[in-house]
């Protein structure tokens, strides 16, 4: 759906207020690190997800429990770092507009235990999903990392004062 938004948020670490306003989902992150499990994490082409984070180094880890790849077709905005972890893959369509401090999109996992210890080491889970970008990903001052057994970039990735890892 053009207005699809992420569903079924369950915060497992940290604190945030999550609210929906028409075609926008706002995640107001209170803690430096936030970890959320989502039933689905899709953004329709007319939809927007905003992460309002305490600062540029704040991290929001989003684990997707869906059996399908996440389809990012709309806008994903954040002033800090966003991890989008879906073992079945993450697809940024040609209409995707990602504007964040930093982005890690991966089929690998990251445990709450490691996050609590300040370790952001992605662990392989044996899934063969792919991460594909056909859209525009812009990171201001951070890293853009697309990590999966298969990674395809047909779009644009821009890291202003940052680094791109494919």
Regions found by a protein language model. Give the residues of each.
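Solvent-exposed adhesion/ligand-recognition segments of exported proteins
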Residues: 1-166
